[in-house]
Design a protein with these regions (language model features):
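Active-site-adjacent helix/loop segment of glycosyltransferases
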Residues: 7, 211-321
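Short, acidic, metal-binding catalytic loop of nucleotide-sugar glycosyltransferases
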Residues: 22-32
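A conserved acidic beta->alpha catalytic loop
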Residues: 23, 39-48, 64
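Short beta-strand/loop segment that forms part of the nucleotide-sugar
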Residues: 32-41, 60-62
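Glycine-rich, basic loop-to-helix element that forms the pyrophosphate-binding segment
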Residues: 62-80, 87-92, 97, 101
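Conserved donor NDP-sugar-binding/catalytic core segment of glycosyltransferases
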Residues: 93-133, 138-145
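Short, flexible, basic/aromatic active-site loop/helix in glycosyltransferases
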Residues: 137-170
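A short, conserved alpha-helix in the catalytic core of glycosyltransferases
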Residues: 163-165, 169-222
Length: 334
């Protein structure tokens, strides 16, 4: 049996399948990995596209849209026997040889539980620009805001090889292209279905770190990500999920004392974000922020245990205040 399952979760993405699935099939070693498409209850012609245009691709069909988190949990549970699983977005283009560096690095480093490639924008020109969803590896700042090597807020760096020295320890790896040891994924509890989508990979990576495993970016590999394939930037639904899930992430993973203090700080920042959205006449985003805090208060009772170790304090790189750095000090790069 092949050691790797590359699982693409699809929801109403027939056009993305036509555009990107051929690159995955062409770029992925058939000796190393099976490519599996898990359809999350699509209502477009995704099933017809898969059956008629990609008849040899392994497929799983779900009866409804379970979201990114539960969709992957179900797919991984059904795709049994693989030592490694790659979570690959349906809007990712893979060049030839992308998977080998990830696999061989994990095989040579048993202390590593998950890895990611460098994530570049899928562009029409030859520029190598890091992509928002993961760039060259993710971190959390002192207030729990995610940022990346190569991307802080909306500022994206060109890849000039500045992060290529060696595979680096990171706090979180992108869910757009994440290779994880399957047994560790299950041990860590998989993706949290309550998140539905957005930031669930950060939560998973936090729990992987709590097991003592490392998460690294392997710069010898890169893939191209379109981004916004499910929910584009500026969509109030995306705003809602990002704000709500960021609060859930901190509440469920931080020790209780640190978590309470940090959530007070985040309420202040989110209040500022609410008024900024109003000032820009983005009423949908402003309402989404309010709903996010309302629903967080309803959902936080679902999480009653807190780890005894504060991982944010254990990783010095995460002590930055990127809000101050970015907006006041004008520090726009990692």
């Amino acid at each position: 049996m092949k050691p790797v399952a590359v699982i693409i979760l699809n929801w109403n993405g027939a056009n993305l399948l036509r555009r990107y699935l051929p690159t995955v099939l062409a770029g992925t070693s058939a000796d190393l990995a099976d490519v599996i498409v898990a359809d999350n209850g699509s209502t477009d012609d995704s099933r017809q596209v898969l059956e008629h245009e990609f008849p040899t691709v392994k497929t799983l069909y779900f009866d409804q849209n379970y979201g990114f988190a539960e969709g992957y949990n179900r797919a991984i549970a059904q795709a049994e026997g693989y030592r490694y699983t790659v979570l690959l977005n349906s809007d990712v283009r893979t060049p030839a040889g992308w998977i080998e560096p990830l696999y061989h690095y994990c095989e040579a480093h048993p202390e590593v539980g998950a890895v990611m490639p460098k994530l570049w924008q899928d562009r029409d020109d030859d520029r190598q620009v890091f992509e928002y969803a993961g760039a060259a590896g993710g971190f959390l700042d002192k207030h729990g805001y995610p940022y990346c090597r190569g991307r802080i807020f909306d500022t994206l760096e060109d890849d000039r090889g500045q992060y290529d020295a060696e595979p680096a320890d990171i706090f979180w790896a992108t869910g757009a292209c994440l290779m994880v040891r399957t047994a560790l994924y299950v041990q860590a509890g998989g993706l949290d279905k309550d998140f539905f989508a957005h930031m669930e990979e950060i939560d998973l990576c936090w729990r992987i770190l709590l097991t003592g495993s490392k998460i690294r970016v392997v710069p010898e590999s890169h893939v191209y990500h379109l981004g916004g394939g499910s929910l584009p930037q500026g969509n109030p639904r995306k705003t809602y999920l990002n704000f709500r899930n960021s609060l859930l992430l901190l509440h469920k993973n931080l020790p209780q004392r640190e978590g309470k203090w940090l959530l007070i700080v985040r309420r202040l920042y989110d209040t500022l974000a609410f008024f900024m959205a109003l000032a820009k006449l983005h009423g949908g985003d402003a309402k989404a922020i309010l709903r996010a805090h309302r629903d967080f208060r309803k959902m936080r009772g679902n999480y009653t245990s807190h780890p005894s170790q504060n991982l944010l304090k254990a990783i010095p790189e995460c002590r930055r205040n990127i809000v101050v750095d970015y907006y006041l000090r004008r520090r726009r790069t990692f």
